[in-house]
Amino acid sequence: MIPLSVRVPASTANVGPGFDSVGIALSLYLDVVVKEKADKWQVIHSFEESIPTDDKNLIVSTACKVCPSISPHIIEVTSNIPLTRGLGSSASAIVAGIELANQLGNLNLTADQKVQIATNFEGHPDNVAASILGGTVIGALDGKDISVVRIESKELGVISLIPNEELNTDESRSVLPKMFPFHEAVKASAISNVLVAALCQKRWEVVGEMMERDHFHEPYRLELVPLLPSIRKCAKEFGAYGTALSGAGPSIFILTPYEKRQEIAEQLARVFTDMKVCELEIDHKGIIVNKEEHIGS
């Protein structure tokens, strides 16, 4: 019998100009199955050897920081979220760790509390809030104050183009400017404002237009993801709303009309043969916990 399992969706962040603020949960998943208690933590997985199998694993270390009193267990982790590709793999692990602590420690955390804790770990709310709440989220971190709003976007389809190459988030952030001119900040903020308003009003053509007019980060990251302009051009010709970097890259995130997502994905796959083209959906559920029996700490 499986006593406890946790499923956490992947996420994409930024959606163009919504830098470190806008996130969308996606239909790729990290699954954690909690097995029996043990003398020490053991993580069973089939990932690369660099991923720890003990209490240094990000899921376990997060859980132990949230609730140090929980007993060690054997857990089994599976995931179809690509690592270091801009699809929130580390955020999903952090969220899974928080939920693991919540369940094993009987913490009864609210969704808002989970977002607060996860943001403190991650440093920004976009990926973690999307994975916790599902759907599309807009978040702001101001000192210790975190505000998150969730909206539904069920009319949208999602395509992700995933390259074979990894791109470390720290490397992708290193190309960003340390300072931003005031007039550029005003322009970039205005575009981000219109993106959020269009998402709320379901004006998808405007969403697509604003996605492709970012000034905060994409112009500086083009050297790391040089295919973005050509993918953007093709996607628009094939009927997509808009294209942007997925998080820090290198994956590319495309919003489409829901009914056209398969057709557009097939067309893109014929052009960009060196990339994995994934037809995805927006996950609207967020964290899912299945319990067959109660486990205490």
Swiss-Prot record:
GO terms for cellular component: cytoplasm. It catalyses: L-homoserine + ATP = O-phospho-L-homoserine + ADP + H(+). InterPro entries: GHMP_kinase_C_dom, GHMP_kinase_C_sf, GHMP_kinase_N_dom, GHMP_knse_ATP-bd_CS, Homoserine_kinase, Ribosomal_Su5_D2-typ_SF, Ribsml_uS5_D2-typ_fold_subgr. Its EC number is 2.7.1.39. The keyword Metal-binding does not apply. One of its GO terms (biological process) is threonine biosynthetic process. It holds the Pfam family GHMP_kinases_N. Pathway: Amino-acid biosynthesis; L-threonine biosynthesis; L-threonine from L-aspartate: step 4/5. It comes from the Bacteria. GO terms for molecular function: ATP binding; homoserine kinase activity. Keywords: Amino-acid biosynthesis, ATP-binding, Cytoplasm, Kinase, Nucleotide-binding, Threonine biosynthesis, Transferase. It is found in: Cytoplasm. ATP binds at P82, L83, T84, R85, G86, L87, G88, S89, S90, A91, S92. Catalyzes the ATP-dependent phosphorylation of L-homoserine to L-homoserine phosphate. Belongs to the GHMP kinase family. Homoserine kinase subfamily. HAMAP family: Homoser_kinase. NCBIfam families: thrB. This is Homoserine kinase. The lineage of its organism: Bacteria, Bacillati, Bacillota, Bacilli, Bacillales. The gene is thrB.
